[in-house]
């Protein structure tokens, strides 16, 4: 077909790569959690409000990371709220309530693109380790365990986590996966 110059259309086609990477996270399907776990997620704020700040600071930093570097990063983030510990409780509580709402919505949250689950072998945050094991088993998603890493495995072992992410992206590029 011939178009007049003023009607010529240039089409640019961009291909977007799609993928899902979960780092020390959990599935949002209600079937993975107990009613008690969801109930507790909805009540983090009042719990954090009555928890002595110094004890919460210690538990938060030690509970999320295995390395000094990871613990110091968590402590530094939390220390931004040192004089506003009630604000920290409010923000954390809000985040956990939103998580509980997403779970209670009972949406399918089906992952239909290439995916990778990453979890620290020493993750002590809630039931993250068991959630990831079940997620891997039920959905068949690849799961990589990070040695000497806790819940913030990307701060405990950043080189290993980055290597896995780069491998995942390279594999998606090689396959030409698009979204």
Regions found by a protein language model. Give the residues of each.
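Active-site loop signature of alpha/beta-hydrolase-fold enzymes
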Residues: 28, 125, 152
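Short aromatic-enriched loop/helix-cap "lid" or pocket-rim segments at secondary-structure transitions
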Residues: 31-35, 129-131, 156-158
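Flexible "cap/lid" loop of the alpha/beta hydrolase fold
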Residues: 10-48
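Conserved loop-alpha-helix segment in the C-terminal half of the alpha/beta-hydrolase fold
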Residues: 112-149
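Glycine-rich nucleophile elbow surrounding the catalytic serine of serine-hydrolase chemistry
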Residues: 1-2
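Alpha-helical elements of Rossmann-like donor-binding domains used by nucleotide-donor carbohydrate transfer enzymes
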Residues: 76-77, 91-98, 130-133, 160-167
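Conserved alpha/beta-hydrolase catalytic His-Asp/Glu region
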Residues: 31, 49-110
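Catalytic active-site module of serine/aspartate enzymes centered on a nucleophile-bearing elbow/loop
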Residues: 139-179
């Amino acid at each position: 077909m011939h178009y007049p110059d003023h009607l010529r259309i240039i089409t640019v086609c961009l291909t977007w790569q799609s993928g899902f990477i979960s780092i020390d996270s959990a599935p949002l399907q209600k079937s993975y959690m107990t009613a008690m776990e969801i109930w507790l997620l909805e009540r983090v704020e009042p719990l954090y409000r009555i928890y002595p700040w110094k004890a919460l600071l210690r538990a938060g930093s030690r509970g999320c990371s295995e390395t000094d570097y990871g613990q110091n990063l968590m402590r530094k983030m939390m220390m931004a709220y040192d004089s506003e510990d009630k604000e920290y409780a409010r923000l954390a509580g809000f985040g956990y309530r939103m998580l509980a709402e997403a779970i209670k919505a009972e949406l399918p949250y089906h992952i239909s693109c290439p995916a990778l689950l990453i979890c620290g072998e020493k993750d002590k945050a809630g039931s993250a380790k068991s959630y990831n094991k079940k997620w891997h088993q039920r959905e068949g998603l690849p799961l990589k365990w990070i040695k000497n890493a806790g819940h913030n495995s990307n701060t405990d072992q950043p080189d290993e986590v980055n290597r896995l992410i780069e491998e995942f992206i390279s594999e998606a590029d090689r396959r030409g996966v698009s979204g």
